[in-house]
A protein has these predicted regions:
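Charged, helix-rich terminal subdomains or tails
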Residues: 1-504
Length: 504
């Protein structure tokens, strides 16, 4: 959460650097979210040189602090009054194409004899990131130290101020606050409840300031800062998977990672506002997306945490089982108990439709189910790959898990069938072992293999399921598929059932 907040703060820092150069306010930001920004700057004398001057300073600072891990590209187009008022599509397309060109040569102005190799002043490496050099073994680099302080601050504060200081006048006033030093300017995180600091900031005057998760000064931004807490500390992922849901109710202690984002949002911005296009519509849509992912998402997570039969009350301070790793712009990454993540994906899709009330604006997702001991970064990467698989489906609005992609219109039905299967196992109508064996037989590659497996499956049901009604229901679910996609969906249902049950 904290490293991604750092990236978000750096995006804002870049944005405000241009505004500060031209003496502009936050009103000149058309949008600034999801790692990108669109600004309205004046076409005055020397404006190109001023843009390049700011870019050189910011890019040099980023390269010094983060090497090539974090940087940015920029471009601009000129608009007359009519083009600006109507926010013409051809200008948006031109700007996008110019940005794509810049991506292919983003370090071309920074390449010199020291770009590829530079002798370090020290030989010790940061204990946290393993890439930046430090003075002594066991120390953290400046960047990792900032991330650690951000983490401590986020755990203790839900509402805060983020001040951007280009003049340096707040170094003494805010010397005890968390500072992200960009060398050419400083960003400070401030406790909103510190009345004394608040008064000093207002009295001194400030360049730019943002209020996080409440309304106070400057722009209001919503950041989904939600993690499971116990005794004031963030629960480890092992505890999230093992202690927050009952094993009797939800089976294996697996961790789930959910990654989702809005389908075709770029196309919606470019072409979906074609009738009476305007900057205000563009800005409104951008802010509505940010509000959903930064504000409403927290309440969705809290709702699912309360609804699940869980141990969340006794094992957390804030009755929440989900760790929001990132949420902003039009996408999210959330970590939690696997069974909770399965339900959360359904609820986010449902809530997003209610929020937009537009069947043409959808969301897609990818889910990873993994052991809590596996590195989280690998799980997030897999969830991202699953999301990419969902994005390849015609019309999208899909979710991928367990190597299969399902349309989200069908996903709720899948979870309903899982609950039915779970009941059959919990009430001992069928053993978990027999159910697992049937699932293994059904895990086929084509419809012909499925048809060949039906006689054996019917025999297994006859031998192992004594209740005639339940046997008929299982026959109906298992032996009536007409396409391989339906078989794939059935196997996903059975795998999820196995995961969420225990052998008696």
């Amino acid at each position: 959460m904290e490293d991604l907040f750092l990236i978000s703060a750096i995006t804002n820092c870049i944005t405000y650097s241009y505004l500060h150069e031209f003496g502009l306010t936050q009103s000149n930001i058309i949008f600034n979210t999801g790692g990108g920004a669109l600004l309205l700057l004046p076409k005055c004398d020397g404006y190109k040189e001023r843009i390049e001057k700011v870019s050189d300073v910011v890019q040099a600072a980023l390269l010094q602090m983060f090497n090539t891990d974090i940087n940015y590209i920029y471009s601009f187009v000129e608009c007359d009054a009519e083009e600006l008022e109507q926010f013409k599509i051809d200008k948006a397309i031109l700007l996008k194409s110019l940005l794509e060109e810049e991506k292919l040569r983003k370090f071309h102005k920074r390449i010199d004899e020291k770009f590829f190799y530079q002798s370090p002043d020290n030989t010790s490496v940061c204990i946290m990131c393993g890439s930046n050099f430090v003075k002594r073994d066991g120390e953290q680099c400046e960047v990792c130290d900032s991330i650690t302080k951000l983490s401590d601050f986020f755990v203790k504060h839900e509402q805060m101020l983020l001040l951007y200081d280009f003049s340096g006048k707040f170094k003494k006033i805010l010397h005890n606050c968390v500072c992200i030093d960009m060398h050419f300017m400083q960003m400070y995180l401030i406790d909103s409840e510190d009345i004394s600091l608040y008064k000093q900031i207002v009295k001194s005057g400030y360049d730019y300031i943002e209020t996080i998760n409440h309304s106070c000064l400057g722009n209001t931004r919503w950041i989904a800062n939600l993690v499971p807490l116990k005794d004031g500390n963030v629960l480890p992922f092992e505890d999230i998977s093992e202690k927050l849901l009952s094993k009797e109710e939800y089976g294996d202690s697996k961790l789930g990672i959910l990654k989702m984002d809005v389908d075709n949002l770029g196309a919606i911005f470019a072409f979906g506002l074609s009738k009476t296009r305007s900057l205000s519509k563009y800005l409104t849509l951008s802010r509505l997306m940010e509000t959903f992912f930064g504000y409403h998402l927290i309440h969705i997570c809290e709702k699912i945490s309360r609804e699940l039969i869980s141990k969340v009350k006794e094992n957390t301070d804030n009755e929440n089982m989900f760790y929001i790793n990132y949420a902003g712009g039009d996408d999210l990454v959330i970590i939690g108990p696997a069974s909770g993540i399965l339900l959360l994906a359904k609820e986010i899709d449902h809530s997003f439709y209610q929020y937009t009330n537009n069947k043409n604006i959808n969301i897609s997702g990818g889910i990873t189910i993994m052991s809590p001991s596996k590195p989280i970064r690998l799980g997030i990467k897999e969830a991202e790959e699953n999301l990419s698989a969902s994005k390849k489906v015609k019309g999208k609005h899909a979710i991928t898990l367990l190597d299969r992609t399902i349309k989200l219109e069908r996903y709720e039905h899948v979870l309903e069938i899982v609950n039915v299967f779970k009941e059959y196992i919990d009430k001992k109508y069928i053993s978990r072992t027999c159910f697992y064996n049937m699932m293994s037989i059904l895990d086929v590659n084509n419809i012909e293999e499925y048809y060949h497996s039906i006689p054996l499956l019917m025999y297994m049901l006859k031998r192992n399921v004594l209740n005639e009604r339940i046997r008929c229901e299982l026959k109906k679910e298992i032996a009536t598929k007409n396409t391989i996609e339906e078989v794939y969906e059935l196997v996903v249902e059975m795998k999820l059932t196995i995961m969420q049950t225990r052998e008696s």
